Curated annotation (Swiss-Prot):
Protein species of origin: Ligilactobacillus salivarius (strain UCC118) (Lactobacillus salivarius)
Any one biological process term the GO annotation gives: translation
Entry superkingdom: Bacteria
Record-linked NCBIfam families: gatC (TIGR00135)
GO molecular function, a single term: ATP binding
Function summary: Allows the formation of correctly charged Asn-tRNA(Asn) or Gln-tRNA(Gln) through the transamidation of misacylated Asp-tRNA(Asn) or Glu-tRNA(Gln) in organisms which lack either or both of asparaginyl-tRNA or glutaminyl-tRNA synthetases. The reaction takes place in the presence of glutamine and ATP through an activated phospho-Asp-tRNA(Asn) or phospho-Glu-tRNA(Gln).
Protein name per Swiss-Prot or TrEMBL: Aspartyl/glutamyl-tRNA(Asn/Gln) amidotransferase subunit C
Signal sequence interval, chain numbering: none
HAMAP family hit by this protein: GatC (MF_00122)
Swiss-Prot/TrEMBL catalytic activity: L-glutamyl-tRNA(Gln) + L-glutamine + ATP + H2O = L-glutaminyl-tRNA(Gln) + L-glutamate + ADP + phosphate + H(+); L-aspartyl-tRNA(Asn) + L-glutamine + ATP + H2O = L-asparaginyl-tRNA(Asn) + L-glutamate + ADP + phosphate + 2 H(+)
Keywords, comma-separated and alphabetical: ATP-binding, Ligase, Nucleotide-binding, Protein biosynthesis
Length: 99
């Protein structure tokens, strides 16, 4: 399965990335190589290989989840540049236009 520049353009558009023509050619080649490597891996016979769910024998080392009192909300809100209805207001980063 070969990856073409149209597929790379489509994925780049979904990620809101823009490439120059030279970059598009470079990334198209790199993506094609990656897809070919994954295809090679899928052809490996793993019939007698035991299933691996964890690479190591490490156990969960997270601490117990304990609720503690946080910083006063009113004090925190005094330090934000803009707020609205008790929330911190930030610039929009998601383009909701239809593309």
């Amino acid at each position: 399965m070969a990856i073409g520049s149209e597929e790379v353009k489509h994925v780049a558009g979904l990620a809101k990335l823009a490439f120059k023509d030279e970059e598009l050619a470079k990334f198209t080649g790199q993506m094609d190589e990656i897809i070919n490597m994954v295809q090679q891996l899928s052809e490996v016979d793993t019939t007698d290989v035991p299933v691996t769910t964890h690479v190591t024998d490490a156990i969960n080392t997270l601490r117990e989840d304990v609720a503690v009192k946080g910083t006063d909300r009113d004090l925190l809100m005094k330090n934000v540049p803009q707020s609205q209805d008790g929330y911190i207001k930030v610039p929009a980063i998601i383009d909701e236009s239809e593309e």
